[in-house]
Structure formats: structure tokens, C-alpha cells
Amino acid sequence: MPALRKHPQTATKHLFVTGGVVSSLGKGLTGSSLGQLLTARGLQVTMQKLDPYLNVDPGTMNPFQHGEVFVTEDGAETDLDVGHYERFLDRNLSGSANVTTGQIYSSVIAKERRGEYLGDTVQVIPHITDEIKSRIVAMAAPDEHGNRPDVVITEVGGTVGDIESLPFLEAARQVRHEVGRENCFFLHCSLVPYMAPSGELKTKPTQHSVAALRSIGIQPDALILRCDRDVPEALKNKIALMCDVDIDGVISTPDAPSIYDIPKVLHREELDAYVVRRLNLPFRDVDWTQWNDLLKRVHEPHETVRIALVGKYIDLSDAYLSVTEALRAGGFFHHAKVEMRWVASDDCELDSGAAAALADVDGVLIPGGFGIRGIEGKIGAISYARKRGLPVLGLCLGLQCIVIEAARSVGITGANSAEFDPATPDPVISTMADQRDAVAGEADLGGTMRLGAYPAVLEEDSIVARAYQATEVSERHRHRYEVNNAYRDRIAESGLRFSGTSPDGHLVEFVEYDAEQHPFLVGTQAHPELKSRPTRPHPLFAAFIGAALDYKAAERLPVEIPEQRSNGVELLQEPASRG
């Protein structure tokens, strides 16, 4: 591996990613991909998202509006872009990686009430911007091992010109002034639309976007030109001239075949080389060993497997972003392409509906969610799959639905969750003791669930222990309800096994059927998808995809469960690329 080139020691560098013209240009993926490139050059990189909405966090936001809530190890409910950061950087981030306007104003108002401003008139400048700056600069603090990041990449949410983003942009401008221009870099993402009638690419939106950014005191150092095709050199030269950006900093980023190709696109345009030169960073050549192996698995699969995701929020795929990425990573482990079948849970309430939706799939995933809508459909999908030996993986609410279905199968006909039916005679899923006030409306809903990483102990001979190759694991959680221990013995009569619990044995963390009864029907109260990486697939997802591939390869029996079938777990080994 090439050694780092020697340069004088410098302070942590700050790189800000902004966006203009329209939203959804891929600022998060651009920043994540650049972070991956800098990491592959031997640099320590961390990332942060500044969100301009007034919510304190996305924990209580509608999934149809916001997408998934990404939970960090320390229990913060954050924006889904933080998931991209973790997956591309292959490192865990904390709650400080996501800052919202709601957090900033809450903190400033609390300080004012405590008298910390000593009678000052509290204003956006300096008090709000100072609070934002303190969150940005805090990202440069040493980690638990004493290592200070070389680069902090901060994505500023929203679009330049939006009133909500102005305090964050002003704070970023002030950071550049305070840490020094040589230690700060602004990367602006803009749209270059193609006008089909005239057959032209238009640069005027980008010029106007940069003009708006310059009007508030920020001159971008580089431009990411988003387009459905390559931007010709002549247009790049024009944009460089009109926007006063070095030609080396004008980066064409046409649509890529997959999100994992974006680092290659940026590297081809030499953005990473330009950044390390401008910031005078120590660096080595990019080590592509791991990423090239990933891209080979992405683009050259040996086989295909079809997975049904039976969910409530399928109209917005971002509501299940980490789940779908974890499934794809599980496929990469087996050199397989995962085809997603999006199934509305309501469609599976009747066995005929489940048969129509699931007849030609190789596995069923039941993701998390809240509320009663679609629950009977999730349970119906589990019942259909259980009777046919179809592999199932249930996450959080998915585990609870597996337990309800098992209870009903042994005659507990009223089995339900206290969440869906508070008056149920058989609450096999009950409210956690410390969550009752929140459920009753007597405490805040936001930030009060069982959140973050918790340990679990697995039974040695279980499917999940073989998948993890361990009996002590830690996973991230986000829930208020748990398996009711009073029903464990009766539910076990169905053959469902409580194969993992909290260390004290009180809280059920994993359930499964023995392989002799079903090849792979596993549920976890956790959200293991949050810890999956494209280069290090989560073992539970890799095992699930392995079982689905086995199911596809075997003769499908319409009703009878096969006596023996490999569950794919024994295939799990550390691939050379996982490092």
C-alpha cells in the first residue's frame, strides 16, 4: 500500500456541500462518495447533515414525507442521509451527525431562559449562527481513540435561495472566515437541464444558483454538474468562466448505473485530487481493492433472487432505504442480484391475496412500522410463507407479527398487540413498562422510544447464532412494544423458538423456527439493516438471502414444508473484501 505523502501538519479541514436550482440532486450521495474517496486515500473523514426543518428530529415525522428514520449507535433519530454516510465511510456516526433548526432554536431558547446570554437581545446573528457553528466545529473533536478527523464533510440541506437554509449558510461562511480559507472548501451541486426540443444543455440555472450563493458571501470552490448525460468540455469552460471557478473544479456527474459507481465518476473527473490539492492534505493514491470487488459483485452477479418487501409505506421507497440497501448487500455477499417486489401489506390479508403477491418470490421481508393499518396483511404474508417453507425475515414490527401469527396458530385466536388493540384479551405483544406514559399521551413521543444499540444473547445452536457466528451481539433498536413474557410457553407450542434475549433474559430479541420445521423464518426486535455496509453485509441479511437462493434452487412444493433444506447460514464467511 503506498505511503502517505508528507506535508506539514494542518488543522482539520471543513468541506461544505450545498445544492441549488432544485432539491434531490444527490448532495448526500455526492458527499458520501467524496468521503469514500478521501478515506480510500488514507484520510480520516467524518460527515454531518444540517437540516433546515423545525422538527427537533425526524422521529415523529410521516414516513411518506421524510422517508426512513436512521438510528445511530447512541440512539439518535436522524436523517436517512446519515445512513448513506455510514455505509460509504464504513464507520459509525453519532447523533451529532445530524443538526436541525429545531435543535438549534431549542438550545438557544433554553440558554436564554437560563440567563446564559446575560441580558442580550437574542437574534439569528450571532446567537443562532454561533450555535450552528459550535455543532459544526464539534465534529472536528478527537474520537474515543484520540484521533482527530482530517476532513469534516458537512451537507447543508435544502436549496440555496430557501429562507430556511440561510442561517446555516451564514454559519458556514463564518466557519470559513474563522478556520481560514485554506482550511475550508465549498462544493456546490447544481442542475444542468437538457432541453430536448433544442437538443441543448442549459447552464443558466447553474449561473443563477452560484450568483445566489455568492450574494450571501460564499464563493464555491467546485461545482457538481448534475445531468442525464456528460457535460461537454466547452460548456464546462463556460461555467468555469461565468461562475469564477477553476476548470479543474467543474465536475460533470451524469447519472450512474448504481449509487456505488458515483465514487468512480467523481474520481474520473479528478474531484478528489482537486480537493486534496486545494486543502493541502496528506494523501496516497486511491486504494480501489475493496471498492472494485464491490462493483464486480454489483454489475456481474452470478444469479438473481426475488424478495418481496411487505410494507405499509411502499409508495415511497426511501421509507425502507436501509432495508433495501441491506438486502442488496446480502445479495452482493452471494454474488447475487436482489430484485425487489414491493407488496402493499393490505394485499396479503387474505390467503388468496398473499398467494397472488408472493407466489413467485424467493423470500419475504417484513419491515418495521407503526399503527394498525396493514397489520393483518403482514400477518397473512407470514402465515402464507410459513406453510410453504418460504424464507422470512421480520424486523422490529416484523418480529411482533411473527409472534402474533404463531400464537394464533396454536389457538390463541384473540392474540394481538396492545398497539393495535388495547382491549385485546390476549396481548401477546405488550407495551414496555417505561413506555406506558408516552403511549397514554402523558409524555413526549419524540425521542422517547427504546433507541440505540442494545446487547443480546443468542442460543448456541440457533440459526441466528450460526448467522452471526457469535452468541453475544449488539443491534440498534427503535420500539415501544415487546413480546409479553406471560405468553412465551404457550407460543412455544407452535414451534417458535425464542432464540435470543436481552442479557437478563427478560426481553425477546430474536425468534425463529427450527430448520427442521421451516428452513428460515427469523425475526428480530432490532433494526440490523442500520449496521449493514455494502462492503460488509450484515450476517442476518446474508443468511436470509442465502436461504432465499436455496429456496429458489430447490423444487418448490405448494403446501408441504420440505423436510430438509439448507438455510444458507453455513455459506457465511468473511469475504476477502470485507477487511
From Swiss-Prot:
Binding-site list for Mg(2+): 81, 155
Biological process annotations from GO: 'de novo' CTP biosynthetic process; pyrimidine nucleobase biosynthetic process
Gene3D superfamilies: 3.40.50.880, P-loop containing nucleotide triphosphate hydrolases
Cellular component annotations (GO), alphabetically ordered: cytosol
Binding site for UTP: 23, 202-207, 238
Functional note: Catalyzes the ATP-dependent amination of UTP to CTP with either L-glutamine or ammonia as the source of nitrogen. Regulates intracellular CTP levels through interactions with the four ribonucleotide triphosphates.
PANTHER family: CTP SYNTHASE, CTP SYNTHASE-RELATED
UniProt family annotation: Belongs to the CTP synthase family.
Protein name per the record: CTP synthase
